[in-house]
């Protein structure tokens, strides 16, 4: 089968805008291709990178199904200057809109769990259904750093670009610097044209707009004009609108006028799914015990977790050895130690007692009341998981006879967790609260 025909056949699998904007610009490079390597030329580096990331595997799979042969797909930038003139899509327009957008940040690569499904659902709905934009406008996504807010924001951007929409993505810092630069150059008209004449405006870390009243005034008018023109606005922040410091009341009111969706730290099963997805994307193979170790040993910052995965792969590649659990522990030991130094057993005891509405002195006593025993075991379990305290040190803290009593409590609570999903969820929630507090 002619590889060029593969792209034509793929047209049936994609929407018209998606095909016309991207795959229709590819040209099969017969000279550089081989039996097991198919090379396609894209108009420029930006397009090549985007298409390789988003469609490379899909093209390879489609080729195998249609021809019965396997081949690696390589999308590269066409070297001739003439290529930019022949493309059906305005490349300069795309670069101006989406240079900052990460093509790997898509809805397909986002791992959905209980902690983020509302935010995910809202963003995906407006990205694919224009009518919902009028109802869900603006969308305000908030939560701690590193949990996927930027991923969702850029997923909306990438999906909107595929539909031929004009997208502007900017962090608050980008927005402020853009305004300041145009103000100094006497070119505010250029600034206004850029931000007001878009279909979709994506603002990351909107909480940092509160630096000056002038910046907020500019954003207020831009916000109103986009919304009045039926444009879509999505923002992210670390806190909900009513808790934003330095932001004017009229802006807070605008932010809260649509959907407010929070993203919370993921539960263990979602963390494991995220790690698997990151491994798949980076083509890294990790065993289940290593994945579980990473998930239970690190906090919930997804960028941090991905950094560890890439570091593990780098160590293994450079040293020429397999990624083992021992290697993982060695690579992660300083990182885990740093985390644990920020968490004390007193912090854990205080939070657990507050959750169970009991006194710390009761937990540290010999009382055998069921809720006190359970709380005590949870404190011990979390202390073993989140701190560097040894069993003898914990035995001393609880004034127990020796460390075997601590070991017994750890064994009991572990069995309880395995058989009680609600208890497992509660402990995971407590763990996340402690980790968030330690990082603040």
Curated annotation (Swiss-Prot):
Region (Domain I, interacts with DnaA modulators): 1-74
SMART domains membership: AAA (SM00382), Bac_DnaA_C (SM00760)
One GO CC term on file: cytoplasm
Domain IV, binds dsDNA: annotated span: 317-440
Residues engaged in binding ATP: 146, 148-150
Region span, Domain II: 74-99
GO function terms (MF aspect): ATP binding; ATP hydrolysis activity; DNA replication origin binding; lipid binding
Transmembrane residue ranges: none
Principal location listed in the UniProt entry: cytoplasm
Assigned keywords, A-Z: ATP-binding, Cytoplasm, DNA replication, DNA-binding, Lipid-binding, Nucleotide-binding
Entry function: Plays an essential role in the initiation and regulation of chromosomal replication. ATP-DnaA binds to the origin of replication (oriC) to initiate formation of the DNA replication initiation complex once per cell cycle. Binds the DnaA box (a 9 base pair repeat at the origin) and separates the double-stranded (ds)DNA. Forms a right-handed helical filament on oriC DNA; dsDNA binds to the exterior of the filament while single-stranded (ss)DNA is stabiized in the filament's interior.
Protein family according to the UniProt entry: Belongs to the DnaA family.
Protein name: Chromosomal replication initiator protein DnaA
